Swiss-Prot record:
Record's protein name: Geranylgeranylglyceryl phosphate synthase
Temperature-dependence annotation: Optimum temperature is 55 degrees Celsius at pH 8.0.
HAMAP family according to UniProt: GGGP_HepGP_synthase (MF_00112)
UniProt entry keywords in alphabetical sequence: Cytoplasm, Lipid biosynthesis, Lipid metabolism, Magnesium, Metal-binding, Phospholipid biosynthesis, Phospholipid metabolism, Transferase
EC number, UniProt record: 2.5.1.41
Species whose genome carries this gene: Methanothermobacter marburgensis (strain ATCC BAA-927 / DSM 2133 / JCM 14651 / NBRC 100331 / OCM 82 / Marburg) (Methanobacterium thermoautotrophicum)
PANTHER family tied to this protein: HEPTAPRENYLGLYCERYL PHOSPHATE SYNTHASE, PTHR40029
């Protein structure tokens, strides 16, 4: 089954949780342990990427995950090096509010031949950085959307949908002190038919409940996993929060 179909099947019944793992933060063996714990906690898939610039680390981690887990492995590339043949799909995304055309379409053009050659399912996605934006906002040379301007985010989402992007990701930034505002999530959801993904600043079940209740279809957590001494319990808390609507 294609990953996009997998998403739609789940969304017919409930919200989706994805766990983000950065290959640079641990060994492939440790990444497998984290993924297995997250799956026991209820996560629906593993996102792989982030700050990585070493394609060999990414490939080794993706390969180890492929041998040990059954949920989809989805690439979340930080640059053209973020591609591996072991993945099921890739968030093929454009950083819409970057000031640098490289992050809007340049990196995508450079990476597309590899994605095509490897036969990875490409999930067309608009990626929008919201204040404070974190590292991705700085590296991606963005103009983060102000938290009190949901209409700007909605305009970007509609433009992305008209350009054929079937997924849309609101990003507050890794380790952000607050998640994307509920008002912004709700307006974006009302204005488009895209699968809406929200990440950044989601640390607790209560956070997850607010974000899911506002309209997010998919919630992504990463930093909270890196900082948790019990990944399974933390993911279960977040997943249960999402289901408490």
């Amino acid at each position: 089954m294609k990953v996009e179909d997998y998403f739609h099947d789940i969304l017919g019944e409930r919200k989706i949780h994805l766990t983000l793992i950065d290959p640079e933060e641990q060994t492939p063996e440790e990444a497998v342990e984290i993924a297995e714990a997250a799956i026991r906690g209820g996560t629906d898939g593993i996102m792989l990427g982030g700050s990585t610039t070493d394609s060999s680390e990414l490939d080794a981690t993706a390969g180890a995950l492929r041998e040990n887990i059954d949920v989809p492995i989805i690439l979340f590339p930080g640059n053209t090096t973020g591609v591996s043949r072991h993945a099921d799909a890739i968030f093929f995304m454009s950083l819409l509010n970057s000031n640098n055309p490289y992050w809007i379409i340049g990196a995508q053009a450079l990476g597309a031949p590899a994605v095509k050659k490897m036969g990875i399912e490409a999930l067309p996605m608009g990626y929008l950085v919201v204040e404070p934006g974190g590292t991705v906002g700085w590296v991606g040379d963005t103009k983060p959307v102000p938290r009190n301007k949901p209409d700007i985010a909605a305009a970007y989402a509609m433009a992305a949908e008209f350009l054929g992007m079937r997924l849309f990701y609101l990003e507050a930034g890794s380790g952000a002190p607050q998640h994307v505002p509920e008002e912004m999530i709700s307006l974006v959801k009302r204005c488009t038919d895209q699968i809406l993904i929200v990440g950044g600043g989601i640390r607790t079940g209560a956070d997850a409940a607010r974000v899911a209740g506002a309209g997010a279809d998919i919630i992504v957590t990463g930093t909270v996993v890196e900082n948790s001494s019990n990944v399974e319990d933390k993911i279960r808390e977040i997943v249960e929060g999402m289901g408490s609507l």
